[in-house]
Each structure stands twice: as structure tokens, then as C-alpha cells.
Amino acid sequence: MKQIKRVLKILAAGLLLGILAICLVYLLPCGSLQKHASESLKNAGQEKLHPKILKTEGENPFLLEGYKGSSLDNYTDTLMITQAVYQSEEPFYKAAMLSERKNNGKDQPIESLREYLENLQSGEVVSYSRYWHGYLVVLKPLLAVMDYGKIRMLNLAAFLLIQVLLLIGFLKRKL
């Protein structure tokens, strides 16, 4: 019985922490997020050196041609960015729970994001509140200070750091 109570307390604490975290990032002003998302749509032609994103890369470009494991999912990334930059008219706590974004009615999230950033009034408001959008807890603050290309580079650096730390751990244990 003690074990069940402990698990329920941990679950409740996690739930409250998740709600608090998502509500806090919805307090961030969307101006800088929209500016950096807009920068991510520009600077075409530099993808090989510094991936700026989206419009010129398309929805699923390959880093290594023909190798499916190197495919980038710009389609989903764009949906996530659109979710992050949307300025809801609802209070922050309600906006955090509704998870709204603008959609142009077509199945083209890159165009939908571009249209929203060019004309903040265009498109219909779509809500996707089925699950907790925890990625926004990280994405919104990062997008407030850098564009998507830099976020990709930061992600790569974090991935490489984790790989090096794992390798060091394996070497220490002689595995």
C-alpha cells in the first residue's frame, strides 16, 4: 500500500510539474519567437553549410542521399514551430491547455507557417489538445533566442556530447 501511495504522489507531482512548465512557457512573448521562425524560412540556399530550414529543404530532405535514416522531418518540425509561435487570444493557462495554432486549410505546414508569419490573421485556428505538448517547454525558450538552424546545431552538439559521455562510461567500465 505504501508503494502505491508513493507512486501516486510521484505521478501527481509529475502532472503538476508538467502543467506548470507548459503554462510558464506560454508566458513568453511571441514576438521574438515569430522573428526567429521567420528567419528560419529565409536564407535559402545555405542548407548544406548551415541548415536554415523549411522552404528550400522541403518536408523530408535527406542529409545523405538515398539513406532513409538521414531524413529530416521538416513536416513535423514545422507543425511544432507553428504551435510555438502562435499568439493565442486566450489567457496563458488556457492557451497552454488548448495547444492552438493557425492552419491555412491545406496539408502544407511550411506554407501555413509562412502565411501566418506574413499575416498573423490568416488561416483558421486549430486546437490539438489531445496530449501534452512537452516539446514546447524546450522549443519556445530556444526559439525566443535563436532560429531553427541554430536549434538543430545545438541538438547535434547535445547528441554528440551524450555519445562522448557514453563512450567514456563504457571505457571506464571496460565494456
Where are these regions (language model features)?
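Membrane-water interface at transmembrane helix exits
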Residues: 21, 25, 29, 139, ...
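Transmembrane catalytic cores of multi-pass membrane glycosyltransferases
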Residues: 123-126, 131-140
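Transmembrane-helix motifs of polytopic, lipid-linked glycan transferases
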Residues: 157-175
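Hydrophobic secretory-pathway targeting helix
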Residues: 1-38
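Juxtamembrane segments of multi-pass membrane glycosylation machinery
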Residues: 138-155
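Short hydrophobic alpha-helical membrane-embedded segments
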Residues: 129-133, 153-161
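Short extracytoplasmic/periplasmic juxtamembrane "stem" segments immediately C-terminal to an N-terminal membrane anchor
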Residues: 39-56
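Interfacial juxtamembrane loops and adjacent helix segments
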Residues: 54-128
